[in-house]
UniProtKB/Swiss-Prot annotation, chain A:
Name recorded for this polypeptide: General transcription and DNA repair factor IIH subunit TFB4
Cellular compartments per GO CC: nucleotide-excision repair factor 3 complex; transcription factor TFIIH core complex; transcription factor TFIIH holo complex
Cited function: Component of the general transcription and DNA repair factor IIH (TFIIH) core complex, which is involved in general and transcription-coupled nucleotide excision repair (NER) of damaged DNA and, when complexed to TFIIK, in RNA transcription by RNA polymerase II. In NER, TFIIH acts by opening DNA around the lesion to allow the excision of the damaged oligonucleotide and its replacement by a new DNA fragment. In transcription, TFIIH has an essential role in transcription initiation.
InterPro entries associated with the record: TFIIH_Tfb4/GTF2H3, vWFA_dom_sf
Organism: Yarrowia lipolytica (strain CLIB 122 / E 150) (Yeast)
Chief subcellular location: nucleus
Localization annotation: Nucleus
Species classification: Eukaryota, Fungi, Dikarya, Ascomycota, Saccharomycotina
UniProtKB/Swiss-Prot annotation, chain C:
Protein name per UniProt: General transcription and DNA repair factor IIH subunit TFB2
Similarity remark: Belongs to the TFB2 family.
Biological process according to GO: nucleotide-excision repair; transcription initiation at RNA polymerase II promoter
Location in or out of the cell: Nucleus
Principal subcellular localisation of the protein: nucleus
InterPro entries: Tfb2_C, TFIIH_p52/Tfb2
Quaternary structure note: Component of the 7-subunit TFIIH core complex composed of XPB/SSL2, XPD/RAD3, SSL1, TFB1, TFB2, TFB4 and TFB5, which is active in NER. The core complex associates with the 3-subunit CTD-kinase module TFIIK composed of CCL1, KIN28 and TFB3 to form the 10-subunit holoenzyme (holo-TFIIH) active in transcription.
Source organism of this protein record: Yarrowia lipolytica (strain CLIB 122 / E 150)
Domain of life: Eukaryota
GO CC field: transcription factor TFIIH core complex; transcription factor TFIIH holo complex
């Protein structure tokens, strides 16, 4: 009589060959740091990249009629949600745009209302994203040099996670979420390690895959690779540094990054990450075989710090403990030379 | 508590009253002619009663010189009186010979605070390192208990040449934990709850009784002791127990409610009275009835007050029905406390306080130790081949120019379809597919390189022993002890062992896997020996 | 779209010849709609191929899918092949160029195609709003449903609709009128989206008969699915066939035209949710209620169920709609009716009545869970498992006896003969029942012939050996 059992006590078949058709929410985080784009302008122009991103967004929306998208931009001053816009913002921005478009004669933009060849849903999203993104780019605050090297990836990730949390978990809609990070990266870029790692751990816990598409020569490849690795995301470096080229971005996006979270268990991911999991000293940044570990914050050191304090958590070590670490074995009268 | 009987002495009707507290017997005539007779029960040497078949119903009490005789109207009364007297006399005599313990003995422990009884001197297992290391028996038992540990011990000490003291010196904590757990004994428990009268085949009731149980019972319930002492010289033991287990006294001590259906037993029911339960008497020092007019607190309580609708809970009812229940609960609580005190690790006052129920106090948050972590920005970055970070100045103007130019000449989506890009797209696809193939390839190699379980086992044993030796080596290295050289020798032997184990693997592919698996351990041994050499020379 | 209807549309499309499909793929809207019907792996693969100029190697696809999900890959490839989106050669897979071009156009735009409908650029003098459209859709649709159930609300659907109902087997002609069939009962229990698709598929089937180009019909249907609610569209974008269809669709309440000669039309909610999730759709009566009450916002009313089912089999339905009450009456023994509620009980008789009319237990259970009150939906089990199990058991009761036609073989001369023949029957696999004690057995009709021959051969053998 188990056949008619109304209660669903059986575990789901893990080898379920039929895919669940849940819609998914894609959070795209776009690097809007103009100097970085300027550096790679010979390889790909911003507008080309923007167009590619829009096509990708349309493709994502095409996959399922309830798919939704969230676009966030970040630069040295911070991060901002570009789509969905705050209500009220939309009308003012589009008005601005129309004014601009009237003054500049660009045949492509003006009849946007009259171009009916694109699916309406795509069109509305595209327009808002374009407006907001260009806004962000145009109104970049070019502040002092030192501060230009900060990058607000952690802020952008937090915004994305917050948005996902609200729309998927709090509102309890049946959606899967994922994050795509499109970064260009300045070579002197500095990323706040701990806040970003916290965001990665949060994404890991919520089972949100974080994909990374790297277009430029930014540093911190290792740390972004780690992010993809721990969340089972895809890492692709298509910058010239990696002997590839960001040209053809749209094809990269449509073939590498299009896969839905519900499809991912069934396919091999085209990820390029080879994370080096070896331990590294916090002081010298070299890889460490045998070293010392702080008993409070667990940071690894290859030598005893000269100021007797831990570099990360600032605890002082007592003389006695440090002296004990430096002891050597007693020399015997007869030296036994051991041949390994 | 006193018993009164109608009795006639020398043909004068009177009232015979026996007081348990004062251990006195007093006979007062109804009509005041004769003098009352007072007998101290401790002095009673002989007690006689007329036999069953005799017509007379008389009781003769010999206390000292003069015997007194009392006549009763019916046999039953006489029997009762005789029983009471017997009990009291034997008790009085006993008390006379053994002076009673000081009044502050049992009775003073009130339920609120527990005074810990003197620590029982017991053979305590020493918990310090030295004795643990010397206790071979303990070590043997632990090895037998834990198979894992036994295996490691066999591999390192028996086969590998490690000294047992070395082995245990880093595992003292395991020994200590094991010693503590194996020394735990079961504490005292309410023995009456274990005695369950079972009904036999032909309606006989059987009870299992062992001398230990009897001893426990006397320990926990002094009333039983009293009853036993009073009656057993006279009654047979089996009879006594038989009657005891059927009596209401037994039920009361177990904490069950006494219903009117239970059989009464004149002998046993005497002990039901509160005079035998000193503690209860002391605890119930409050007067029975507090006038409602005065008892403001009692009137106010929500639970007790009937104006709130439902009848109050069984434990909250005023009057005699409430008292029975409450007394039962209280006596059980007292018993539990007594047992806890008797146990071997009595609680200090502070610890006793922690036993109290605290679920109404609200949650205490977790206490975290705050770490002051310095926010250094590029922490965790491994240096690749780049040297220092160089800061090229930022050209804000160029950037603005670039953005504006881009904004004015946007790329439409449709233009992406242009043939110019085809080559790029093809290449992009190729790269993506390459990544997929690479991933798939590495995946497949993982599948193929599974080691044969037997080989794996052997290598694991060798590996564990090596790690053990490495641990000891580093321990000694840091301590600067003299053992270091022998440890260095042992490490050399380890390498030989590893090579031997790997050499034993016949199959080509497995051999390769084995070599790969042991490579990192060998590196660590080499590293250790190098450090040792440097230390020796430098 | 519920998976049932995905499947039926898929089946229909797979049945079309390649040339037709290629013509179908010339409309980006259709490409998009068909794209969304495909399984997930197919969609991912296609996306990777739209901009790629070269065909992809079969080995690439094999490498992409994990070995444990082989079955998925095979199913996907099969489906894509049947729909002529992929053509496979020895080592390569080529995507249908028309499909590729037009799907890309849907994503990228700019080629001035009109498959997504052309909104009107002139103002409508008699503009209507969304609430009106909803009300209109509901009233049209419910008219049809009421007609099927038999409640009289005064209006009858147009002849075209009646024709459709007859041809689809939902109603049958009887004594001058139409009577609902078993299939019709099942139809009533489905949700609106499924109902519309049933009718549309039927329309599609009839269209070939009526010499309407199925490509046009499908294009129009898919275009409707991509239109925006509340926007009026011009007829200039439609072909003749499609204009003709408009009249029929008007009768179903899928589109609204002020009069037959209007140059514009409005899609209703029934149209715009043709290709979307059922969750986004309100049932027809709920829309009507919401429109009349005029208070609840659309998202809230979207999932307002109205049925409460207790574990003692009692049912309380907070509805006043005669349609819903009529539907409930099919399988619930309704006892009392109040101003805003009807109550009743599900018992064996009521469920048997439904079962005898061809409704399955699954349909009843689905209907109940879809229309369950939000309070019920919040619980771990939406419907009490006891009731669900019992409905299924009542259905099983109908199958207590299963009749199979067969031949009875009896009166064997001796036990040996019986044993031989029955063993032979068993080996053939045609033995249905045997009783060795009485030396009888029953075999299937088909197998009886062979057994008779076997017996004849055996008797001959015995006779010859005896002689």
């Amino acid at each position: 009589m188990n056949a008619i059992d109304g209660t669903s006590r059986q575990l789901k078949d893990t080898e379920d060959q039929t895919l669940d058709d849940t819609p998914s929410l894609l959070s795209i985080i776009i690097d809007a740091h103009v100097p970085s784009w300027e550096e790679i302008k010979s390889q790909i122009s911003i507008s080309e990249a923007v167009a590619s991103i829009l096509v990708f967004i349309n493709a994502h929306l095409a996959l399922h009629n309830s798919n939704s998208v969230n676009v966030i931009g970040y630069n040295a001053s911070g991060a901002r949600i570009l789509y969905p816009p705050k209500s009220g913002v939309e009308s003012t921005r589009s008005k601005e745009r129309e004014e601009r478009s009237e003054s500049v004669s660009d045949g492509e933009q003006a009849p946007s209302k009259k171009d009916h060849s694109m699916y309406r849903q795509f069109k509305t999203v595209d327009e808002v994203v374009q407006t907001e993104l260009w806004n962000m780019l145009n109104h970049t605050n070019y502040v002092e040099e030192e501060k230009q090297h900060n990058s607000a990836i952690s802020g952008a990730l937090s915004l994305a996670l917050g948005f996902i949390n609200k729309h998927v978990f709090v509102d309890e809609s049946r959606m899967r979420a994922r994050i795509l990070l499109l970064t260009v990266g300045h070579k002197n870029e500095t990323i706040q390690y701990i806040p970003t790692m916290n965001c990665i751990f949060a994404a890991q816990k919520l089972k949100i895959p974080v994909d990374v598409c790297k277009l430029g020569p930014g540093s911190d490849q290792v740390f972004l690779q780690q992010a993809c690795d721990s969340t089972h995301g895809i890492y692709m470096d298509i910058s010239e540094k990696n002997s590839k080229t960001p040209k053809g971005l749209v094809q990269y996006l449509l073939s590498g990054f299009i896969s839905d979270p519900s499809l991912r268990p069934h396919i091999v991911l085209p990820t390029q990450s080879n994370v080096d999991f070896r331990a590294a000293c916090f002081l010298t940044k070299q890889v460490v075989d045998i070293g010392y570990v702080c008993s409070v914050c667990l940071c690894i050191m290859s030598q005893i710090p000269s100021n007797r304090r831990c570099p990360t958590c600032d605890t002082t070590y007592s003389e006695k403990t440090l002296a004990g670490l430096g002891r050597k074995p007693l020399k015997k009268k007869k030296k036994k030379v051991v041949k390994p | 508590m006193s018993h009164t009987f109608q009795a006639t002495n020398k043909k004068v009707l009177g009232v015979l009253s026996i007081s348990a507290e004062t251990k006195k017997l007093e006979w007062t005539p109804v009509s005041g002619d004769r003098a009352p007779i007072n007998v101290n029960l401790a002095n009673v040497t002989n007690l006689q009663a007329t036999p069953e078949n005799s017509a007379k119903i008389m009781l003769k009490i010999v206390a000292g010189d003069d015997p007194s005789t009392f006549a009763f109207s019916n046999r039953g009364t006489m029997i009762e009186c005789r029983d009471v007297l017997q009990g009291l006399v034997s008790r009085a005599r006993r008390e006379a010979s053994n002076p009673p313990p000081s009044a502050t003995g049992d009775g003073s422990s009130t339920p609120a605070t527990a005074t810990p009884p003197p620590k029982k001197e017991e053979k305590k297992v020493a918990m310090d390192d030295k004795s643990l290391l010397a206790d071979f028996q303990l070590q043997q038992t632990l090895l037998k208990e834990s198979k894992e540990l036994g295996k490691v011990f066999a591999a390192t000490v028996i086969h590998g040449g490690l000294k047992p003291e070395e082995f245990w010196s880093i595992r003292v904590h395991l020994l200590r934990a094991f010693a503590l757990t194996s020394n735990q004994k079961k504490g005292p428990y309410n023995v009456l709850s274990t005695i369950k009268p079972t009904t036999g085949s032909d309606n006989t009731v059987n009870v299992q009784l062992t001398p230990e149980k009897v001893k426990d019972m006397f320990d926990q319930y002094p009333v039983v002791q009293t009853a036993y002492d009073d009656n057993v010289p006279r009654l047979k033991e089996s009879d006594f127990w038989a009657r005891f287990f059927q009596s209401r006294l037994f039920k009361k001590l177990r904490g069950e409610r006494i219903t009117h259906k239970d059989p009464t037993d004149p002998l046993m029911d005497r002990y039901l009275d509160d005079e035998y339960d000193k503690e209860a008497a002391l605890a119930a020092g409050m007067p029975d009835k507090v006038h409602r007019f005065v008892d403001i607190g009692g009137n106010d309580s929500q639970a007790g007050s009937e104006s709130f609708g439902n009848r109050p809970d069984m434990t909250m009812r005023a009057g005699s029905s409430g008292r029975d229940v409450v007394s039962v609960i209280k006596s059980i609580n007292r018993l539990s406390e007594r047992l806890a005190q008797k146990s071997e690790a009595p609680l200090a006052e502070k610890e006793y306080g922690t036993l109290a129920l605290a679920d109404l106090q609200g949650e205490t948050g977790a206490e975290y130790v705050p770490l002051q972590v310095r926010q250094s920005d590029t922490n965790g970055n491994k240096k690749d081949s780049d040297g220092d970070v160089d800061m090229t100045p930022l050209d804000a103007e160029a950037c603005k120019e670039y953005v504006h130019s881009q904004y004015d000449n946007p790329v439409s989506l449709a233009s992406l379809v242009h043939d110019d890009y085809s080559a790029d797209y093809a290449q992009a696809w190729g790269n993506v597919q390459g990544a997929v193939n690479q991933q798939k390839g590495s995946w497949e190699t993982v599948q193929e390189s599974l080691m044969d379980p037997k080989v794996l086992n052997d290598l694991l044993v060798v590996h564990t022993t090596t790690i053990e030796f490495l641990r000891h080596f580093w321990h000694n290295f840091q301590e600067g002890s003299a053992e270091c050289s022998s440890m260095a020798n042992s490490l050399a032997k380890c390498i030989k062992r590893i090579d031997a184990a790997v050499g034993e693997v016949k199959d080509e592919q497995q051999h390769k896997l084995a070599v790969g698996a042991m490579a990192s351990v060998k590196t660590s041994i080499h590293h250790a020996l190098k450090e040792y050499d440097i230390a020796l020379r430098g | 779209m519920t998976s049932q209807f995905k499947n039926s549309i898929n089946d229909y499309l797979e049945g079309l010849p390649e040339a037709v499909l290629t013509r179908l793929y010339q409309s980006p809207a259709t490409c998009l709609a068909v794209f969304r019907l495909l399984p997930a792996l197919a969609r991912t693969l296609i996306m990777g191929m739209i901009f790629n100029p070269d065909p992809i190697a079969v080995a690439d696809v094999d490498a992409l899918v994990k070995p444990s999900s082989q079955r998925l890959k095979l199913e996907t490839q099969k489906k894509l092949r049947l729909l002529h989106i992929f053509t496979e050669t020895q080592a390569h897979i080529i995507i249908n160029p028309t499909f590729k071009k037009n799907l890309r156009a849907a994503l990228v735009g700019g080629d001035q195609n009109i498959s997504f409908g052309v909104p009107c650029d002139t103002e409508d003098k008699h503009k209507v709003d969304v609430a009106f459209l909803d009300a209109h859709a509901v009233s049209q649709w419910e008219m049809i449903l009421h007609f099927m159930v038999g409640t009289s609300i005064g209006r009858t659907p147009s002849d075209g609709v009646l024709n459709l109902l007859k041809h689809s087997g939902l109603m049958e002609p009887e004594r001058g009128g139409l009577r609902i069939t078993n299939a019709g009962f099942q139809f009533l229990l489905q949700d609106v989206n499924a109902q519309i698709w049933t009718l549309l598929l039927q329309y599609l089937n009839m269209s070939e008969y009526l010499q309407m180009d199925p490509v046009d019909v499908l294009n129009f249907i898919f275009m409707l699915g991509s239109l925006e609610l509340g926007q009026d569209y011009s007829l200039s974008a439609l072909s003749e066939t499609q204009k003709h269809m408009l009249e029929d669709l008007r009768d179903y309440g899928i589109v609204y035209q002020r009069k037959a000669s209007s140059r514009r039309f409005y899609p209703t909610r029934l149209a715009t949710t043709l290709t979307s999730e059922t969750a986004a759709l309100r049932t027809a009566s709920q829309s009507m209620e919401a429109a009349t009450q005029d208070t609840i916002s659309s998202s809230v009313a979207a999932d307002s169920g109205f049925i409460i089912l207790e574990t003692n089999f009692r049912l309380y339905a907070y509805t006043e709609s005669p349609l819903q009450i009529a539907v409930l009456n099919l399988f619930v023994n309704l006892k009392t009716r109040f101003a805003n509620m009807v109550t009743g009980q599900i018992n064996r008789d009521s469920v048997r009545f439904a079962l005898s009319n061809g409704i399955t237990a699954e349909q009843i259970i689905t209907y109940l869970s879809v229309h369950a009150h939000p309070r019920m939906k919040g619980m771990e089990h939406v419907l009490p498992p006891t009731v669900v199990d019992q409905i299924k058991l009542w259905q099983l009761e109908m199958d207590r006896i299963r009749a199979t036609d067969g031949y009875l073989f009896s009166e064997f001369k001796n036990f040996d003969e019986y044993k031989d023949v029955s063993t032979y029957a068993k080996e053939l696999g045609v033995l249905l029942y045997e009783n060795p004690g009485k030396r009888k057995f029953v075999s299937t009709l088909a197998g009886s012939q062979q057994i008779v021959e076997f017996v004849k051969r055996r008797n001959q053998k015995h006779r010859s050996s005896a002689n």
